[in-house]
């Protein structure tokens, strides 16, 4: 496919000390890598060369392919990726203990890939956009925060029994449909295809004939060794260690030792739809600031805060919107070819008065 020969993989490298990072930076610079060219520099090393360099200098480094499924610059990307970790990292595949989901895939989608059975699924977020920091996250449980604990939690095999001292408790996810490469499509022609439609119509644009950008969902279908149904996804009540509040997370009966995940919509987007105002508007930003300052941060508002407290600060409609997201009662037009998916909480009912049923629902909290 287009750009298959380039094989560029955005890779995270975690090391236990600043000195280790300096040693790696010095060696990469010596090899001609311009690390100052960009926040995510293209260094001209293959995945095998990068792994060899890093692990020779820091054996305890963690090497994690980032946003593993996006079409470009990713491990499994349809436009420039590989079909397996072995193909990408060769003899160092055994040192790849995790992959990162990216916005357009969920842990459940990754659980369908056989070679990931023995690897952790982690989720992080962009480091280049302040308001979007932490929109996806990995929650660890460990006696004390340390690199050793993080390394141990990520390295351990997901099928191991017992409860280790350091482990991944769960991950916090975007709805993958909201990611901008979830479905296959062609932005210029407004063409968006599900995997079923892609199989029926092919990977050329039905309007102009140009190649489509094959989306993450289609790529997962191409490489999967099992169906989504075989995962036996189920809802689990997970108790937060911070305040004892229970949240609903998604786990798998087929893979019971896999850390579960919870899917969220960014708070500003919920407020914006609830108030019928743009995300960047003063009205939305003021409400957002009021909530996080009073209740203790965006994740606390989205996951743990009592709905009645949210209603006091932001109004009943915002509170009901957050509750609907917690319950998964939303509709999303999937993203494709660089276009983000669109979340709808009220299915076109923006601006209407709060329904009586919603008032009753709110009174339960």
Cite the ranges covered by each PLM segment.
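Active-site neighborhood of phospho(di)ester-bond hydrolases with catalytic His/Asp-centered motifs
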Residues: 1, 64-66, 98-104, 120-128
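C-terminal functional module detector
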Residues: 1, 9, 15, 27-30, ...
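Extended substrate/RNA-proximal surfaces in nucleic-acid metabolism proteins
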Residues: 1-97
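Active-site environment of divalent metal-dependent phosphoester hydrolases
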Residues: 20, 70-73, 104-109, 123-133
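Short amphipathic alpha-helical segments and helix-helix/interface helices
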Residues: 51-55, 109-114
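Short acidic, glycine/serine/threonine-rich loops at helix termini
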Residues: 75-79, 111-112, 133-137
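Extended hydrophobic/aromatic segments used for targeting, binding, or gating
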Residues: 90-91, 105-109, 330
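Short, surface-exposed basic-aromatic patches at helix termini and helix-loop junctions that form
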Residues: 91, 111-120
């Amino acid at each position: 496919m287009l750009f298959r020969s380039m094989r560029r993989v955005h890779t995270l490298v975690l090391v236990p000390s600043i000195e280790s990072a300096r040693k790696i930076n010095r060696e990469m610079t010596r090899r001609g890598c311009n690390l100052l060219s960009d926040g995510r520099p293209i260094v001209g090393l293959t995945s095998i060369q990068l792994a060899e360099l890093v692990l020779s200098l820091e054996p305890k480094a963690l090497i994690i392919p980032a946003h593993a499924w996006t079409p470009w610059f990713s491990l499994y990307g349809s436009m420039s990726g590989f079909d397996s970790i072995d193909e990408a990292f060769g003899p160092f595949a055994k040192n790849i203990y995790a992959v990162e989901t990216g916005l357009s895939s969920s842990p459940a989608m990754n659980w369908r890939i056989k070679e990931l059975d023995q690897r952790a699924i982690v989720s992080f977020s962009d480091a280049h956009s302040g308001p979007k920091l932490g929109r996806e996250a990995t929650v660890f449980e460990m006696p004390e925060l340390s690199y050793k604990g993080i390394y141990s939690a990520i390295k351990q095999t997901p099928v191991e029994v017992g409860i280790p001292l350091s482990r991944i408790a769960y991950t916090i996810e975007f709805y993958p449909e909201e990611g901008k490469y979830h479905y296959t499509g062609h932005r210029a022609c407004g063409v968006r295809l599900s995997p079923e439609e892609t199989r029926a119509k092919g990977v050329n644009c039905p309007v102009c004939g140009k190649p489509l950008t094959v989306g993450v969902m289609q790529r997962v279908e191409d490489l999967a060794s099992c169906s989504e149904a075989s995962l036996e996804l189920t809802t689990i009540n997970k108790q937060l260690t911070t305040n004892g509040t229970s949240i609903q997370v998604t786990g798998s009966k087929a893979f019971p030792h896999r850390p579960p995940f919870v899917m969220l919509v960014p708070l500003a987007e919920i407020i914006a739809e609830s108030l019928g105002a743009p995300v960047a508007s003063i009205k939305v930003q003021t409400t957002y600031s009021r909530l996080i300052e009073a209740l203790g941060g965006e994740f606390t508002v989205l996951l743990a805060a009592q709905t009645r407290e949210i209603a006091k600060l932001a109004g009943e409609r915002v509170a009901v919107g957050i509750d609907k997201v917690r319950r998964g009662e939303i509709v999303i037009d999937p993203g494709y070819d660089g276009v983000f998916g669109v979340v709808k909480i009220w299915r076109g009912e923006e601006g209407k008065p709060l329904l009586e049923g919603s008032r009753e629902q709110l009174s339960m909290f």
